[in-house]
Amino acid sequence: MKLGWIEVAALAAASVVSAKDDLAYSPPFYPSPWADGQGEWAEVYKRAVDIVSQMTLTEKVNLTTGTGWQLERCVGQTGSVPRLNIPSLCLQDSPLGIRFSDYNSAFPAGVNVAATWDKTLAYLRGQAMGEEFSDKGIDVQLGPAAGPLGAHPDGGRNWEGFSPDPALTGVLFAETIRGIQDAGVIATAKHYIMNEQEHFRQQPEAAGYGFNVSDSLSSNVDDKTMHELYLWPFADAVRAGVGAVMCSYNQINNSYGCENSETLNKLLKAELGFQGFVMSDWTAHHSGVGAALAGLDMSMPGDVTFDSGTSFWGANLTVGVLNGTIPQWRVDDMAVRIMAAYYKVGRDTKYTPPNFSSWTRDEYGFAHNHVSEGAYERVNEFVDVQRDHADLIRRIGAQSTVLLKNKGALPLSRKEKLVALLGEDAGSNSWGANGCDDRGCDNGTLAMAWGSGTANFPYLVTPEQAIQNEVLQGRGNVFAVTDSWALDKIAAAARQASVSLVFVNSDSGEGYLSVDGNEGDRNNITLWKNGDNVVKTAAENCNNTVVIIHSVGPVLIDEWYDHPNVTGILWAGLPGQESGNSIADVLYGRVNPGAKSPFTWGKTRESYGSPLVKDANNGNGAPQSDFTQGVFIDYRHFDKFNETPIYEFGYGLSYTTFELSDLHVQPLNASRYTPTSGMTEAAKNFGEIGDASEYVYPEGLERIHEFIYPWINSTDLKASSDDSNYGWEDSKYIPEGATDGSAQPLLPASGGAGGNPGLYEDLFRVSVKVKNTGNVAGDEVPQLYVSLGGPNEPKVVLRKFERIHLAPSQEAVWTTTLTRRDLANWDVSAQDWTVTPYPKTIYVGNSSRKLPLQASLPKAQ
């Protein structure tokens, strides 16, 4: 071996684990595919090659490695290349707005976007976020998320993504990406992949909770399930031209997500044709050589652990290229991928330096905050980037509110004599909307969950504020009891009320914070803060009780949903800063609810199957999460096991009624599917490397403490690496073929953005009439499901949908197409997609269990 960089022990341990017959194994795939500028990347790829060809080795390395935690203004920043006018890139959370900032908007969460089933709103939200990120001087938004997908209803970060259905998630994921990047900011598709729970996602985090485990959890999944479920939305992201992908903390089949050659090299880069760059989640980088050869392109935040001053890359990456352990083409490819994404969104024309600091709200501070070094300068310029986005946020909040039950209670008229507002979730956080770091508490109304996927509220309109305004405009009376434990007061208010509006919630978040004993993942899926008793007390004392649920996902409502005095139930999710106004718009009929549930409402937690792994189930080794449920999650699981939900996936009521009719199917003149064949071009080197003496620290450089630099300490590479394992034979740790830059065979399922172009060819055109049969304007979402026909397939899978607005008595024809991908299964033996000979049937309706229209499809290939 020529260079180990601390990863030798980890790699050795991994080889022992993977050699055990009873643990899942991730097969190697090498070499790491090099970008080729296919499709819409062609022009920016050429520009990237041109600029990278002019760079020195350390300039290339500077692009690949973060400068260290809290050492610049953003949560992650790369080095810069001043000689070529390439700035340090600013990377910043989150998927719903700018984290650690000010004068920014707090958008609805991804799960709310899923509930809208509205592609336009997904795009507009992405675009609005991109505008704010760009205006703050941020180059890369760390979002959106499709991992977790939602295998477990109690998974802590499900709300950051969209839905446990891959098709619904994939479409809205892609539209969000397009919106962000059209605003001139690189979007990051995360967390890739199988990051489905918080428990054990990071070994150090688990140790902090008292678990003695050697490594992070391994999500063990078969090839078919990976392709048909978890990889599906990431294919949509690649097809949408996403610039960055963030690899995850967990292991996949006992190989870490940021050094897993199967998921990074094979699936993402070779099969899906991803042309952008792969960054690590923060400290998810576990090796130097191993990660570089397995397909990682950018190390974030650059240091091995926060504020350690050490890095797997930086100077060590420079050493690795100089001594030949890592081929030049691999680091060149990293740099080209980063620069291609930079050019693709136009950052070269829109760049402004970050005008805020993540680490202080003070106007002035040190340039390098954590170590109090560098210039003492203006670090916060307090730039207001909100524009008119509050209107969009309010709109999404209202249009994502799912009406689950309505026995004539809604809409309200403002003529109600007395309105009772009941439950803590109606009111404000007594510590302020941003009173808990990263929203790590559940005080007052829940409009955002907790973790790094959050943003500071510029303000938060509570339900109490908004509804009181409504009542007073109607000259009514309003009583509010926001102590969820004061059941006697709640009962007294409910007895007097014309209508009782009960607000309840259920929270979750990221595993580094524990809230009320919930370590990221929910301990259960019941209501928090005595919610069930608040509802039952109100219903026992008021015959017109309407329940509004703010939650991160499904909750158990079996105790009271069918109570005769519960006349209405709405799910409002995590609606962001305009929460109260959004729910008031729906309650008072200014917005007719048209949202559909993006998940299933079961009667028990057990009805969902697939429990979280909350105990160390592999001794002191990496906990093992076996995804034996395969593709059967959420509604697919309920269908397979004949579980009757309370409210099914895709369900949602309206203040009007709709009728679907006249399903027509037209076969299209599609070509026969052809597996991709042939060879790639050989890898190319861009520029010359030169001698080690060119990459020693520049004379006179004033080093910043703990800052990660690309330069080496001396021309003695062994001494510069400071690695006791330096000098081992390559065969002991470098996988076969990992440094081979010759032409490589193309995979059958590859060939374009998102995979083989034949997958996206339209095979059938489908049309359905949709009519508003009621008296008010409203939105309907026709949903098209497919039965793939095989004995081990789900009963139905969602494939197409559209949100359509119709005036009273108006009729429209919804037309969509079915692609080969929509009808295909993954063939593990052929390593390609195939349309099986089993009969295919399509169903159209307005939920996964209300599908009145059906048609058989002719055989397709």
From Swiss-Prot:
Pathway in which this enzyme or protein is active: Glycan metabolism; cellulose degradation
Catalysis performed (reactions): Hydrolysis of terminal, non-reducing beta-D-glucosyl residues with release of beta-D-glucose
Glycosylation site positions: N62, N212, N253, N316, N323, N355, N443, N524, N543, N565, N669, N713, N846
GO cellular component: extracellular region
Signal peptide stretch: 1-19
PROSITE patterns in the cross-refs: GLYCOSYL_HYDROL_F3
Enzyme class: hydrolase
Active-site residues annotated for this sequence: D281
An individual GO BP term: cellulose catabolic process
Function: Beta-glucosidases are one of a number of cellulolytic enzymes involved in the degradation of cellulosic biomass. Catalyzes the last step releasing glucose from the inhibitory cellobiose.
Protein's UniProt name: Probable beta-glucosidase A
